[in-house]
Amino acid sequence: MKTRYERILAGAALWAGFYRANIHRFAEDYLHIELKWFQKILLFMMNVSRVFIYIASRGQGKSFLSAIYCVCRAILYPHTKICIASGTRGQAINILEKIQTDLIPNSPELNAEIDWKQSKINGTNAIIMFKN
């Protein structure tokens, strides 16, 4: 007979496996974001592809989708280090600001995942640390 703790761990492992295979569902359920069908496909492909390139015109939400993927990846795969490379520092910081201003207010679960004592976003140093 399994203990309650062992049953909880087994259930958590099942949900983690499900959400790792369906990252778009994790974004909707955990971050409380309503994704369009093409965003679901892009998130899924980001997760399963070793190399992913998304070329799109202005206003299609590339930064927003990148922010969603970074957050989902950091939560579902503990101890993941994510580096955002861009042409300028401001463009990279833009992704972190999207996390802070667009994603966190809609998801108390995401807010609880972030270690605010070690996180900072300013002009010279920008980092968001997750508790896991």
Regions found by a protein language model. Give the residues of each.
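Phosphate/NTP-binding elements of NTP-utilizing enzymes
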Residues: 1-132
